[in-house]
Amino acid sequence: MSKVVLDASVVLAFLHEEPGAERLTDELLAEACISTVNLAEAATKLIQGGDDPGAVWRDLEFFFPSAEAFTRTHARLAAKLVQQTRALGLSLGDRSCLALAIALKAPVWTADRSWKKLNVGVPVHLLR
């Protein structure tokens, strides 16, 4: 299996054992990576929800060890996506995830249904 990129929404769904999380097989998770922007986004949501920061980082590092640094290339790609994604209300975190997928030429997984309306040159898979 080739590399796949996970959005923060997928990470949160996995950690909270939400519907659709069962689609994240061991094989898929073994090839998964996440942008450091989305890693921070997921950690922030968990900590804001009352989780212990130390436990949050231990879980994220255990389940999602492959975090890709947000580079100038990713920044450029994320900025280029603004016009295409504005109507869908995608955040910087969303565009950062898509930028990583585009840079890696890898499929991306999200729980955000609006992403299926995008045509950014990489496959978009919905968790649910």
Where are the predicted features?
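Short, well-structured N-terminal submotif of metal-dependent ribonuclease cores
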Residues: 1-34, 46-58
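Amphipathic alpha-helical segments within well-ordered protein domains
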Residues: 43, 61, 79-82
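Acidic, PIN/NYN-like endoribonuclease modules and their adjacent C-terminal/linker elements
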Residues: 1-3, 41, 98-128
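Active-site neighborhoods of divalent-metal-dependent phosphate/nucleic-acid chemistry enzymes
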Residues: 66-109
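Helix-loop "lid/cap" segments that line or gate small-molecule binding pockets
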Residues: 42-47, 64
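Short, hinge-like loop/turn segments at secondary-structure boundaries
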Residues: 49-53, 85-86, 125-128
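Alpha-helix capping/helix-boundary segments
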Residues: 10-11, 38, 74, 96-97, ...
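Short loop->beta-strand "edge-of-pocket" segments that line small-molecule binding or catalytic clefts
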Residues: 4, 30-33, 63-67, 107
